[in-house]
UniProtKB/Swiss-Prot annotation:
Transmembrane feature ranges: none
Organism: Desulfitobacterium hafniense (strain Y51)
Domain of life: Bacteria
Protein name: Putative regulatory protein DSY2730
Similarity section: Belongs to the RemA family.
InterPro entries given in the database record: RemA-like
Length: 91
């Protein structure tokens, strides 16, 4: 299994293999998920004090806050996967 890394802004990098979803923080259920992760000590704030624009939920139950738009993170993720399949057509 290859480790794929995604830049989530300000030099912060997350393992793409561990990402379950990338969502906007605006809805009440997502705000509740953020608060529950904060209470459980599973929240990683990678916003550097800026406004949270994307919430990344990982398979380890960690919740990561990013100041980058969800579309940008998703685009980086899909571009990374596309470049990996282009490099290794034997898979």
């Amino acid at each position: 299994m290859d480790i794929k890394l995604i830049n989530i802004g300000f030099g912060n990098i997350v393992s793409a293999n561990r990402i379950i979803s990338i969502v906007s923080p605006e809805s009440a259920p997502i705000k509740r998920i953020i608060q529950e992760a904060r209470d459980a000590g599973m929240l990683i704030d990678a916003t550097y004090g800026r406004r949270t624009r994307a919430v990344i939920i990982c398979d380890s139950h960690h919740v990561i806050l990013s100041a980058v738009q969800p579309e940008t993170v998703a685009h980086r993720l899909s571009a990374k996967e596309a470049s990996n399949t282009a490099e290794d057509p034997a898979d």
